[in-house]
Curated annotation (Swiss-Prot):
Described function: Precursor of the egg-yolk proteins that are sources of nutrients during early development of oviparous organisms.
Protein's name in the database: Vitellogenin
Tissues in which the UniProt entry reports expression: Expressed in liver, ovary and, to a lesser extent, in muscle, intestine, skin, kidney and heart.
Keywords in alphabetical order: Glycoprotein, Storage protein
Biological process, per Gene Ontology: cellular response to estrogen stimulus; response to estradiol
Lineage summary: Eukaryota, Metazoa, Chordata, Craniata, Vertebrata
């Protein structure tokens, strides 16, 4: 597993979980630092070869390269301006996540974790963000994916309607508020405004329901939380 996150000053951190090894690549004084299972490896000790697993970590140009071809990872590279992930040929079609299946197919590349396809690249990218379990954990993003209600009423099939997104939208956890947002276009399923159906019933299986219209919604990209969250 390769995971990427931004810290509170928008610097990128990469975490690689491969075999039983945990590798962290992170910004350090204008360069890239590296930790293996929580222990920092000094630059003068690179290249590093793991004693039991075929993993090599070395300096490459202005960044750090992690190579483990026997485990499916051709290279993970990171420097202060860029990052990339490459898998070996025999992993093509077996991957998932932000980079897709790596099989060259382009018509179904925007498949979200729930199995549904989206037409929107931003919605697709957001769908692969790991939801936080607690708003008190500073190492997590403090956001979750949720269906949202369209703020305005819409007229659908001649009826005033309430509409709910069939695609998940990033939202801050309870007790937190957004400090950075972006606009995304998502599909909405609508029910008559005077319907007796309550919100929980509408949201049950919402991601498989028909799309009645597409509208913009605010996605929360960064959140600040109260001490009592």
């Amino acid at each position: 597993i390769v995971m990427l996150k931004n810290d509170n000053v928008e610097q990128k951190h990469i975490n690689i979980k491969i075999a039983d090894i945990d590798i962290d690549l992170f910004p350090k004084s204008g360069n890239i630092g590296v930790k293996v299972n929580g222990v920092e490896i000094p630059m003068e000790n690179l290249p590093y070869y793991h004693p039991t697993v075929k993993i090599q970590i070395r300096q490459k140009g202005e960044g750090i390269s992690v190579v483990a071809p026997s485990l499916g990872l051709s290279e993970v590279y990171m420097d202060s301006k860029s990052w990339k992930v490459e898998v070996v040929d025999w992993m093509k079609g077996q991957t998932c996540g932000l980079c897709g299946k790596a099989d060259g197919e382009i018509k179904q590349e925007f498949r979200m974790p729930n199995g549904h396809l989206t037409k929107n690249a931003v919605t697709y990218a957001h769908s692969w963000i790991l939801a936080a379990e607690s708003c008190r954990d500073n190492s997590e993003c403090r956001i979750k994916l949720d269906s949202v209600e369209l703020e305005k009423r819409a007229v659908i099939y001649g009826q005033e309607s309430r509409c709910f997104s069939v695609e998940p939208v990033l939202r801050c956890l309870p007790g937190c508020f957004p400090v950075k947002t972006t606009s995304v276009t998502v599909g909405f399923h609508c029910v008559a405004a005077d319907s007796n159906v309550n919100k929980s019933e509408v949201l049950r299986g919402i991601q498989g329901k028909r799309v009645d219209l597409r509208e913009k919604a605010d996605a929360h990209l960064a959140c600040s939380c109260t001490a009592q969250c």
